[in-house]
Amino acid sequence: RYVSWLPLAHVFGQLVDNHYWVRRALHMSIVDSPLNTVDYAKEVQPHLFISVPRIYEKVYSNLKAAIETKAILKIGLKIPLLSSIFKKKLRQAAGFGSNRFSISGAAPINPKILEFFHYLGIPIYEGYGMTENTAGISINYGGGNKIGSVGKCMPFFDLKIASDGEVLIKGDNVMKGYYKNPKATEETIIDGWLQTGDVGKIDSDGYLFITGRKKEIYVSSSGKNVAPLVIEESMKSIPIVSQCFLVGDNRKFCSALITLDMSVILRDHIGVDVNEIPKDPSKQNEMILANDKKLS
């Protein structure tokens, strides 16, 4: 079973929804809206689940909140004889009761979240790729997983790090070029190597770690190179923070634009039951404003 919510306008959605599910004879359930993805997972209990980090972050936040507020869960998970029973119930409640393999991609995911899911017995693995190389170049998997990395290079492809730290890719999965844009193609594919624009490193075991985007690295007025990705992801580990955008080019200091997670405010600060929180952010905001009026 597989829950499909990836946009078919993207190559990864095309790869999985139009090819992989046929080859593997998967029963595919198509989500009517990305906002309902987790609800579909709870109903379908898919064996395969593919997502961006944000959905895993939401599931993680709700599970952690449930554990913190329910003493029986908090205590039960610490007792060896009961731990497996409670973990199974939590997996089922989150929509991962039958899950065999899950992929996280498109953006970095906090290692703490992956560690928590693996602790519960939910096998979520981080991978890496882009449209220009047909979605995938490296991935973690059972028996070959290093949390914090995006895995090892897949067979039949080549991967290396340039002198400036940029990740370079070579293989039959790399595109021929951009449609009717030879200039962009020449700048992106040099001597057969795809210039990804991502900065990373490969450790002694062959695992790839992405540390930032080449074009996003900026220089402060004091001359220090700043990779915003690491700081942004650290800020997003705070439950109430939804998104974070760092700026500081040619400045003495870094500033951050932060958006709050309305569902966490409703759940943790107003006391609304998770199942009663609307999926639509605008409706979440209306609930918060209505609560503020009551308090005033």
Region locations from a protein language model:
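C-terminal boundary motif of the adenylate-forming
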Residues: 199, 238-262
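Conserved AMP-binding/adenylation subdomain of ANL enzymes
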Residues: 1, 8-89, 98, 119
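Alpha-helix-centered segments that form part of catalytic cores
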Residues: 77-111, 288-296
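Alpha-helix/helix-capping structural signal
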Residues: 54-57, 61, 107-108, 173, ...
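Conserved ATP-binding loop and adjacent catalytic segment of the adenylate-forming AMP-binding
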Residues: 28-31, 98-104, 111-165, 173-176, ...
